[in-house]
Amino acid sequence: VIETPGRDATDIIAEAVPAIIRGFHWPKSMRWGTGDLRWVRPLQRIVCVLDGKVVPFEVDGISSGDETEGHRVHGRGPFKVTFRKNYESQLSGAGHVKLTRDARREVILAGIEKVCAEAGLEWIEDKGLLEEVVGL
């Protein structure tokens, strides 16, 4: 029998997440600043919380934490992520960001319908364009 002592989950996460971030392949990626990290967009914050406590680590000069921001124009600035179960509502409320494609599609379609109704216009559906906008 070989017995291996268990490791603390915080230590495992602090080791694994930076490796996952650095190893994640994006078909189109960019570098910014003086770092070497390539990512789909400039990485500004890394939220990593376990049992209400920040799991500390760093990736390319970015330290993990418990704060995030929403939309850069419409959001209300940084806010603490309290629980995973209400992260989506926090991001939507304080951040003015819809986390899922379905939620974004719903908001976009409602906006299209409202503008068309007010202007007496008819929207000619273009699913490809809609999906592109949902992905922005």
Please describe what each predicted stretch is:
Residues 1-136:
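Long, basic N-terminal domains or extensions that often function
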